[in-house]
Amino acid sequence: MNLTASVSMVYDGGHYIVVDSPSATDVHSKELMLKGIASRNIVPGEIQYVVTTHGHPDHFGQGNFFPNARHFFGSYEYSDTNFISTELHTKDIMQLTKNVQLWNTPGHTAQDVTVMVHNVSCCGIIAVAGDLFYNEEDANEAAGIWFQEAWNPIIGKISRNKVICYADYVIPGHGKLFRITQEMKNGADCFTKYETTLDDNKTVQSSPQFQNSIEQVIRKPAETLFSSANSVSFNYIGSPSTSASSSTRAIETTTAYSDSTTTTFYTVDLTAETPSTLESDIIFNSQENLPPLGMKIKKNANYIELPDLSGDVHPMVQSFAKKVSDVLKQPQNEAEISKMMPHLKKWQTTLTKLWKQYMNAN
């Protein structure tokens, strides 16, 4: 069976977060994921957190590509006592980073997790919801495929309503990012059902008061929405007045398996420069109904040509690998390295391969 699903990456104040990864057997989607990460000039070893929205095989399977990350998943997925419980074990919301929360949103499975990304100036609050929503069409249906395949459709409906009433945009499990419309909010009966929940939960810092006026903002074209963000009340688009400009971008391609099967890689960058309409050459298809594109990555003007690598480990690579290893608080001396995972050696090997590929291409 060929399974594909959305893979997301969030950058928040020095933290790289990957949400879901392709199936272990989906080689094409794995390559797309790694290409998407590389497009941000980072390597998998720099990812600090990996969140699995639920335990179905099309949403996890490539976690081994992130050896330095902390992994978050439902407690039912792993029952080994060596795993550490988090706030989500006793609470509905866990603060992962300054602008990112993990929400308990059971429904599709008993252990669904939704990643709430706050203060994205182009889009307000973005919910990375896994299969709680399959796609935009599914979000408008009272009893669609989500209802038929849900672990508990009644609980699932409650979780979906929570997300609809709180977020401005949703990245679904199998489709393009879409905005939450006023029609969706009306169908979820937001004011009567969800405002009380927010008041009772002290962890949630935002409120649904923006709902009266958000529609006039999100109906604008994406470029207008972003460029006019400074003139809009930040209370209802979810951005503080001092926040940096942000961007959300999508990389979408059709897999070799089927003309109708797509895998989507989204990046929500909370510290990006003001987006332009330009994008890197890995954007293949239409960007209709998406927020503004991020800035194309430019080569640093102070870039220094390094000598070609010869031998197993070039001294410059070895030196840089040690600095990277130190930043990641990995062991430095040989005795510690022999006892623990050899992250330093992996960095040396990875950097050597990357540099040789660069030299061959240029």
From Swiss-Prot:
CDD domains: MBLAC1-like_MBL-fold. It holds the Pfam family Lactamase_B. SMART domains: Lactamase_B. InterPro entries: MBLAC1, Metallo-B-lactamas, RibonucZ/Hydroxyglut_hydro. This is Uncharacterized protein C03F11.2. It comes from Caenorhabditis elegans.
